[in-house]
Swiss-Prot record:
NCBIfam families linked to this entry: secA
Descriptive protein name: Protein translocase subunit SecA
GO molecular function: ATP binding; metal ion binding; protein-exporting ATPase activity
Ranges that cross the membrane: none
Species per Swiss-Prot/TrEMBL record: Chlorobium phaeobacteroides (strain DSM 266 / SMG 266 / 2430)
Reaction equations catalysed: ATP + H2O + cellular proteinSide 1 = ADP + phosphate + cellular proteinSide 2
Note on how the cofactor is bound: May bind 1 zinc ion per subunit.
PROSITE patterns, alphabetized: SECA, SECA_MOTOR_DEAD
Region (Disordered): 973-1001
BP-aspect Gene Ontology terms: intracellular protein transmembrane transport; protein import; protein targeting; protein transport by the Sec complex
Cofactor: Zn(2+)
Swiss-Prot/TrEMBL keywords: ATP-binding, Cell inner membrane, Cell membrane, Cytoplasm, Membrane, Metal-binding, Nucleotide-binding, Protein transport, Translocase, Translocation, Transport, Zinc
Residues reported to bind Zn(2+): 1005, 1007, 1016-1017
C-alpha cells in the first residue's frame, strides 16, 4: 500500500530533494560568475562572506561578555544574578536565531565559493598520509544537495563512492564562518588524519585553520587543535576530552570550546553501533583483590565439564528416541535441555540441520514458554546452569549450587542471595533488639548481601566467559592480552575492556595476566554526549533502515540522496544450505570459478575464525588470496587497493567496509566488476548493505550474493519457523541449495527482529543514563562555575546562610546549645554557644543570624591573615576537591545500584522507576554532603609552614602517579589514554594548603610546648 502511495504522490525523499533543487540552480549560477575572478579576488570574496557573518554576531557576543563580567562581581545580589542569567539565556536564543539566518542567507554564495575553489584546485599535487595525491574533485549537484541537507542538521544517506568526504566540506566551510568551531567526527584516528589532510587544500585556500585530535596528543596540543576553525577527530577522543575537561584542576587545563556543530561520518556506526556502551574514564581501585576469579575458576571449570557431559547424555537420549519416533516430545525436551545447557555445542548445531529437528525444538520450547515461562524450570532443573543465548544471561540452578557447595566444601546458602526485605522487616519488628543492636543486625544483612552478590556475579561472569564467549570470534589473545574484536568492523578494539568483571573472567579463562580492577571517575553515553551539540548532522551509506531510531533518540531526519550515476550492481537472492560445511565448500567452488574467469571477488565474513577457515580451504586448493581481519590488519590500505584488480581474491571481516573505496582494475568492468560474496548474514541489515556497497560505485558494474546455512548464528537464534518448515518440506539432500526471494525476505525479517532487540537495549541504556545525565549537568555546571570564577566568596557565604538555618533548626526543639556549639566547632572551627533562653520559637531566626555573624567575622579575620591569592586558591580547592571526591563516590554507588536494580522486577516493581527514585535520593544526599564539606573545608583550610610542605609534596607526587593510571575506555570496548593529574595545580610549591582542624581553646597546643592552646599560639589568633 505504501509503495502505491509513493508512486502516485512521490516518496518523502523525492519531496526533500525537490525542495532543494532551486537552491542548487542558484549555487551553480553564482559559481559560474566566480569563474572570471582571479584567485586573489576569490579569496577576498571568502573574507567578505566571513566578515558579513561575524559582523552580525559580534554585537551580541559583546553584550554576552558584558553581562558575564557583571556576574563576576563578588558583591552581586542573588536577585540581580538571577536577572542577568535570564538575560544571558534570552541573548543566547537571539544569538542562535541570528546565526541561523546569517548562514542561510550566505549558503548559496559559500557553496558556490567552495565549488569554484575545488575547480581551481584540479590537478594540484599535495601529500596525504605520506602519499602523493592529485586533486580531481569538483562537487556534483547531488553532492551540493547532500551539503545542504547536512547544514540543516539532518543525516544524508549517500551510496559508497559518492564522495561523502568532499560533501562535508560545504557545510563545514559555511558553519566555520561563525568562528565557533566545527567538529568532523570519524570512526578512527587514521580516517581523521587522512580526511583532514585530504580536504585541507579547500580550507587553506581561504585561510581557514584545520586541526585534528589524535590519540597520542598532549593536552596543550589538543587545545591548539580545538581552537582551529575546523577540527577532525574520533567520537571517543571528543567524548573523553569532554570528560577530562570536567576533571580539570584549572581553566588552563581545559581544551574544548562549546559544542556548536558536528558532522558525524559513518553516523550509523558512531550513533548506533557504538551507542550500546558508555564512555568511561576509570582509575585503579586501591587494594583491589584480583585473585577472586582464580579462586573460583577450578570450581567453574569442573562445573562446565559436568554440564558438557550432561548435555552429551541428553544428545544420546534424543538420538535414540528420534530413531523410533521422529516427533517425540521427550526427544524435543532432551534437545531443549541441550539448547539451554550448551547452545554452541557443535553436535547439536549439526542436528538442527536435519529434517524436522529445528521445528521440534522450537515447538517444545514454545510449550514451556507459555504463561510467562512458568514451566521452564522443569527444563532447567536437570541442568547445572541455564543459558539464554539471545539475552546473553546465565542462571545457576539449585543443582549447580549444590554442586559448587560440594566442590568448595561450603554451605549451599553461600550461593544464594538473602531476602533483604524480609530479614530487615524481621529485625525492625523484633522487640528483643535495642536500637543500636538493630542497626548492627541490619548492617550485617547488607554486608552478607553484598558479599554473596559479588560472589554470584563473579560465578556468572566466569560461566559467560566459558559458555558465550569464544576465542577468535568475540575476542583474540595477542601478546598475552585479551583483545576485543568489534562485531561490526572486525577490527581489534585496542585498549577496550568488557565491563562488570567480564574481561577479567575471560583473562582468567585464557590463563593470561588479570588486569587490575578499576572504578569509574567520569562517564557519559555516546547519545548524551552528542545531544550536547547545538546542531548535529551525519552521513553514511546506510541510514534508512535505522531512520526511526535516529529520529527518536537524536531528532535527526534521514534524507536519501540520489546517486550521481545509476547503480547497476546485481543483488541476487540468498543461497541457503543446510550445514556450514556445505556452505563453505560452495563458497570455495564459487571463488575458484571467479578467479579462473578473472573477476575479482571480495569474500565477507563475520568473524576472524570464519575468515581463517575459508583461508585454509583456499590454500588447500592453491588459490592465491589476501586475508584482512583483526589479526592481520597492518596491510589494510594495500589489500583494499588490490581488491579490485583482475583475479584478486580478498577475504575480509567487516573491517573493509568503512572509509575505503575499491577501484576496479583494467579490464575488470568487462568481466562484470567486483563480485561480493557474503559468507553469512550479519545480525544487522546495515552491515550487509555496507558489504554489498563495496561494489557498484559511481555506475561501475558489480554483483553481490550471500551464502547462508541453517547453522549460522542468525538462523539458529532468530530464523523463523517458516524458513525451517519450508526447508523441511523441500527435503533437499546434502549439498543442495535453495534460492528463493521468500527465504531472503524471511532472513531480513529475522535481522529486523535482532535490530529491534538491539534498539530496545540502546533505548533502555539511554533511559537509565538520562537520570545520571541530569545529575551530571548539575554537578559539571557547579564545577565549571567553581573553576571559572575568580572569587567564590559570595558562594561560600550563600552556603553559610543555608547551613546556619539548618543547624539551628536541628537543635531548636531541645534548646541544646552545647550540641550546637560542638557541631559548629567541629565543622567550621568557629566558636559559638547561644544561651538556652535564645532558643524560644520567636528567636530561632535571631540565633541563626548570630551564628552567621560569628562565622562571617571568623572568615573576615581569616581573609585579613591570609594573602588574597592564597585565599582564592583555598576557596577553589574547597569547591573542586569536594565535588570531585563526592562525584566519584556517587558514581560508584550508582554503579552498584544499577547492577542490582533488575532484581526488583522479581518483586513486581519497575526497575527503571525504582532506579529513578533511588538515584534521586542518592543525589539529594550528594548535594547536601558537597555543600557541607565545601563550607567546612573553606573555613578550615589554612596555609602551612615550609616544613609541613615537604610531606604534602611527597603525597602529591604519589597522587600524580595514581592519576597517570587513569584509563579512558569506551566500556565493553575506547582507547587507553594517559591523563594529566587532576590534583588542583593552584597550590604553589612554596605555600601549599591542607585541611587543618583548629584546636579547641583548652586543647594542648600542637606546637609541642605542653601549654594549652589559649595560653600559647592561641593568643596570636584574633
Amino acid at each position: 500500500m505504501l509503495k502505491i502511495f509513493e508512486k502516485v504522490f512521490g516518496s518523502k525523499h523525492d519531496k526533500d530533494i525537490k525542495r532543494i533543487q532551486p537552491t542548487i540552480q542558484r549555487i551553480n549560477e553564482i559559481q559560474a560568475s566566480f569563474q572570471s575572478l582571479s584567485d586573489e579576488a576569490l579569496r577576498e570574496k571568502g573574507s567578505l562572506l566571513r566578515q558579513q557573518v561575524r559582523s552580525r554576531l559580534l554585537p551580541l557576543e559583546q553584550q554576552k561578555k558584558e553581562l558575564a563580567l557583571k556576574l563576576e562581581n563578588p558583591d552581586i545580589l542573588p536577585a540581580d544574578a538571577d536577572n542577568i542569567n535570564a538575560s544571558l539565556d534570552a541573548l543566547g536564543e537571539e544569538y542562535d536565531k541570528v546565526t541561523a539566518l546569517a548562514l542561510e542567507e550566505s549558503l548559496p554564495d559559500v557553496f558556490a565559493l567552495v565549488k569554484e575553489t575545488c575547480r581551481r584546485l584540479k590537478g594540484h599535487n599535495y601529500q596525504v598520509m605520506g602519499r602523493e595525491m592529485i586533486w580531481d574533485m569538483v562537487p556534483y549537484d547531488v553532492q551540493l544537495i547532500g551539503g545542504i541537507v547536512l547544514h540543516s542538521g539532518k543525516i544524508t544517506e549517500m551510496a559508497t563512492g559518492e564522495g561523502k568526504t568532499l560533501v562535508s566540506t560545504l557545510p563545514v566551510f559555511l558553519n566555520a564562518l561563525t568562528g565557533r568551531g566545527v567538529h568532523v567526527v570519524t570512526v578512527n584516528d587514521y580516517l581523521a588524519q587522512r580526511d583532514k589532510e585530504w580536504m585541507n587544500p579547500v580550507f587553506a585556500f581561504h585561510g581557514l585553520t584545520v586541526g585534528v585530535i589524535l590519540n597520542t596528543m598532549r593536552p596543550e596540543e589538543r587545545k591548539r587543535q580545538y581552537l582551529c576553525d575546523v577540527t577532525y577527530g574520533t567520537n571517543n577522543e571528543f567524548g573523553f576530552d569532554y570528560l577530562r575537561d570536567n576533571m580539570a584542576g584549572t581553566v588552563e587545563e581545559m581544551v574544548q570550546r562549546d559544542f556548536y556543530f558536528a558532522i558525524v561520518d559513518e553516523v550509523d556506526s558512531v550513533l548506533i553501533d557504538e551507542a550500546r556502551t558508555p564512555l568511561i574514564i576509570s582509575g585503579p581501585v586501591p587494594n583491589a583483590d584480583n585473585s577472586k576469579f582464580q579462586e573460583i575458576k577450578p570450581w567453574i571449570e569442573h562445573l562446565v565439564r559436568s554440564q558438557q557431559q550432561l548435555v552429551a547424555s541428553c544428545l544420546v537420549e534424543a538420538e535414540k528416541l528420534l530413531k523410533t519416533k521422529p516427533n517425540d516430545f521427550q526427544a524435543g525436551l532432551a534437545l531443549l535441555r541441550v539448547k539451554r545447557g550448551q547452545p554452541k555445542n557443535s553436535r547439536y548445531i549439526k542436528m538442527l540441520s536435519q529434517q524436522g529437528i529445528a521445528k521440534l525444538v522450537q515447538s517444545t520450547e514454545n510449550e514451556y514458554l507459555k504463561d510467562n515461562a512458568s514451566q521452564m524450570h522443569e527444563v532447567d532443573d536437570e541442568l547445572y546452569f541455564a543459558v539464554d543465548e539471545k539475552a546473553g544471561t546465565i542462571d545457576l540452578t539449585d543443582k549447580g549450587r549444590a554442586f559448587l557447595s560440594k566442590l568448595s566444601h561450603q554451605d549451599t546458602d553461600l550461593f544464594l542471595l538473602p531476602d533483604v526485605g524480609t530479614e530487615i522487616a524481621a529485625i525492625e519488628g523484633s522487640s528483643s533488639f535495642s536500637t543500636a543492636e538493630k542497626i548492627k543486625q541490619k548492617d550485617a544483612v547488607y554486608r552478607l548481601f553484598a558479599d554473596r552478590s559479588e560472589r554470584l556475579h563473579n560465578i556468572s561472569q566466569l560461566l559467560k566467559a566459558y559458555s558465550l564467549f569464544e576465542r577468535d570470534d568475540e575476542y583474540v589473545v595477542q601478546d598475552g592480552k585479551v583483545m576485543i574484536v568489534d562485531e561490526f568492523t572486525g577490527r581489534i578494539l585496542s585498549g577496550r575492556r568488557y565491563s562488570d568483571g567480564l574481561h577479567q573472567a575471560i583473562e582468567a579463562k585464557e590463563n593470561v595476566r588479570i588486569e587490575g580492577e578499576t572504578q569509574t571517575m567520569a562517564t557519559i553515553t555516546i547519545q548524551n554526549f552528542f545531544r550536547q551539540y547545538h546542531k548535529l548532522a551525519g552521513m553514511t551509506g546506510t541510514a534508512e533502515t535505522e531512520a526511526s531510531e535516529f529520529y527518536e533518540i537524536y531528532k535527526l531526519d534521514v534524507v536519501v540522496i540520489p546517486t550521481n550515476k545509476p547503480v547497476v550492481r546485481k543483488d541476487m537472492d540468498d543461497l541457503v544450505y543446510k550445514t556450514r560445511r556445505e556452505k563453505y565448500n560452495a563458497v570455495v567452488l564459487k571463488v575458484e570459478e571467479l578467479q579462473k574467469k578473472g573477476q575479482p571477488v571480495l569474500v565477507g565474513t563475520a568473524s576472524v575464525e570464519v575468515s581463517e577457515t575459508l583461508s585454509r580451504m583456499l590454500r588447500a586448493k592453491r588459490i592465491v588470496h589476501n586475508v584482512l581481519n583483526a589479526k592481520q590488519n597492518d596491510r589494510e590500505a594495500e589489500v583494499v587497493a588490490e581488491a579490485g584488480q583482475r583475479s584478486a581474491v580478498t577475504i575480509a571481516t567487516n573491517m573493509a567496509g568503512r572509509g575505503t573505496d575499491i577501484k576496479l582494475g583494467e579490464g575488470v568492468r568487462e568481466l562484470g566488476g567486483l563480485y561480493i560474496l557474503g559468507s553469512e548474514r550479519h545480525e544487522s541489515r546495515r552491515i550487509d548493505r555496507q558489504l554489498r556497497g563495496r561494489a557498484g560505485r559511481q555506475g561501475d558494474p558489480g554483483e553481490s550474493v550471500f551464502f547462508v546455512s541453517l547453522e549460522d548464528e542468525l538462523m539458529r537464534l532468530f530464523g523463523s519457523e517458516r524458513v525451517i518448515s519450508v526447508m523441511d518440506k523441500l527435503g533437499h539432500e546434502e549439498g543442495d541449495v535453495i534460492e528463493h526471494s521468500m527465504i531472503t525476505k524471511s532472513i531480513e525479517r529475522a535481522q529486523k527482529k535482532v535490530e529491534e532487540q538491539n534498539f530496545s537495549i540502546r533505548k533502555r541504556l539511554l533511559e537509565y543514563d538520562d537520570v545520571l545525565n541530569q545529575q551530571r549537568d548539575v554537578i559539571y555546571t557547579r564545577r565549571r562555575n567553581g573553576l571559572q570564577k575568580d572569587r567564590l566568596r559570595s558562594d561560600i557565604f550563600d552556603l553559610l546562610e543555608d547551613y546556619c538555618d539548618v543547624v539551628v533548626k536541628k537543635y531548636q526543639k531541645g534548646a541544646d546549645g552545647m550540641a550546637l556549639e560542638e557541631q559548629v566547632l567541629r565543622e567550621l572551627s568557629v566558636e559559638f554557644r547561644p544561651e538556652k533562653a535564645e532558643f524560644n520559637d520567636d528567636t530561632v531566626g535571631g540565633v541563626a543570624d548570630k551564628l552567621f555573624n560569628a562565622a562571617h567575622d571568623f572568615y573576615l579575620r581569616k581573609e585579613r591573615e591570609v594573602p588574597e591569592d592564597i585565599m582564592r586558591q583555598i576557596e577553589k580547592y574547597a569547591v573542586l576537591s569536594v565535588i570531585d571526591k563526592k562525584w566519584r563516590d556517587h558514581l560508584r554507588e550508582i554503579d552498584s545500584l544499577r547492577e542490582g536494580i533488575n532484581l526488583r522486577a522479581y518483586g513486581q516493581k519497575d526497575p527503571l522507576l525504582e532506579y529513578k527514585q533511588e538515584a534521586f535520593r542518592l543525589f539529594v544526599e550528594l548535594l547536601r554532603e558537597i555543600e557541607l564539606e565545601t563550607l567546612s573545608l573553606a573555613f578550615k583550610l589554612f596555609p602551612i609552614t615550609p616544613e609541613e610542605a615537604h610531606d604534602i609534596e611527597v603525597r602529591q607526587k604519589k597522587e600524580a602517579l595514581r592519576t597517570e593510571k587513569l584509563v579512558a575506555q569506551h566500556e565493553e570496548a575506547g582507547s587507553i589514554l594517559s591523563h594529566e593529574s587532576d590534583v588542583p595545580s593552584g597550590t604553589a610549591a612554596q605555600q601549599p594548603i591542607k585541611a587543618d582542624v583548629k584546636p579547641g581553646r583548652n586543647d594542648l597546643c600542637p606546637c609541642g610546648s605542653g601549654k594549652k592552646y589559649k595560653n600559647c599560639h592561641g593568643q596570636q589568633q584574633p
